[in-house]
């Protein structure tokens, strides 16, 4: 029985390796991140929910996943391009989880001594909050819960989203380094 599951796992990973070399899979990754970014902009500009500094950082992590999808789609059969896209995907997904967990902690355990930064800490050579204020200018408070769905706040849903992105990254990364039958013999 164990042998069956090992063979099935190798078969699935081999299929995933082939999928990672196809443009549509990378475009699907980019489209999913774009849909979440557009949702964030809807919450901000239509529902008038002000983003905080952590929200801005979480947006940036999501944009990293979007960019990874676009990079991977640009030349999915090129090993260097695919590796670069995988690295950006993994870094952005893990960074996003860490940010969302920290943001959730701020909301669940507010402190009278904690206040959000007024400005994001972007490098001086890339002040995104000045270049694109409609996307990166924080005006809200990190500890405020301004929206909930099924009893969970936005950062809690982002933990779910970034966790799924991280899980998919791990699965696809494992499949990418898996040697196929032709390479084994």
Curated annotation (Swiss-Prot):
HAMAP family assigned to the protein according to its UniProt record, in alphabetical order: DsbB
Protein name: Disulfide bond formation protein B
GO cellular component terms listed in the entry, alphabetical order: plasma membrane
Keyword check for Cell membrane: yes
NCBIfam families, alphabetized: PRK01749.1 (NF002485)
Pfam families per UniProt: DsbB
Keywords assigned: Cell inner membrane, Cell membrane, Chaperone, Disulfide bond, Electron transport, Membrane, Oxidoreductase, Redox-active center, Transmembrane, Transmembrane helix, Transport
Signal peptide limits: none
Gene3D superfamilies documented for this protein: DsbB-like
Gene Ontology terms: biological process: protein folding
Functional summary from the UniProt entry: Required for disulfide bond formation in some periplasmic proteins. Acts by oxidizing the DsbA protein.
GO molecular function terms listed in the Swiss-Prot or TrEMBL record: electron transfer activity; protein-disulfide reductase activity
Transmembrane residue ranges: 26-42, 61-76, 84-101, 157-175
Subcellular location: Cell inner membrane
Record topology, Cytoplasmic segments: 1-25, 77-83, 176-185
Periplasmic topology ranges: 43-60, 102-156
Cysteine pairings via disulfide bonds: 52-55, 116-142
Family according to the record: Belongs to the DsbB family.
Organism expressing this protein natively: Psychromonas ingrahamii (strain DSM 17664 / CCUG 51855 / 37)
UniProt topology in membrane: Multi-pass membrane protein
């Amino acid at each position: 029985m164990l042998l069956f599951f090992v063979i099935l796992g190798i078969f699935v990973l081999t299929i995933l390796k082939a999928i990672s070399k196809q443009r549509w899979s990378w475009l699907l990754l980019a489209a999913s991140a774009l849909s979440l970014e557009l949702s964030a902009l809807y919450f901000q500009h239509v529902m008038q929910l002000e983003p905080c500094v952590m929200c801005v950082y979480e947006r940036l992590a999501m944009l990293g996943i979007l960019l990874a999808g676009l990079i991977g789609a640009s030349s999915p059969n090129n090993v260097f391009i695919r590796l670069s896209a995988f690295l950006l995907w993994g870094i952005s997904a893990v960074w996003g989880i860490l940010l969302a967990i920290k943001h959730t902690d701020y909301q669940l355990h507010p402190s009278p001594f904690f206040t959000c930064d007024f400005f994001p800490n972007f490098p001086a050579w890339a002040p995104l909050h000045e270049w694109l204020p409609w996307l990166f200018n924080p005006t809200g408070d990190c500890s405020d819960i301004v929206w909930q769905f099924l009893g969970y706040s936005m950062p809690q849903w982002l933990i779910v989203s970034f966790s799924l992105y991280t899980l998919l990254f791990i699965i696809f990364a494992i499949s990418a380094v898996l040697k196929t039958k032709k390479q084994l013999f």
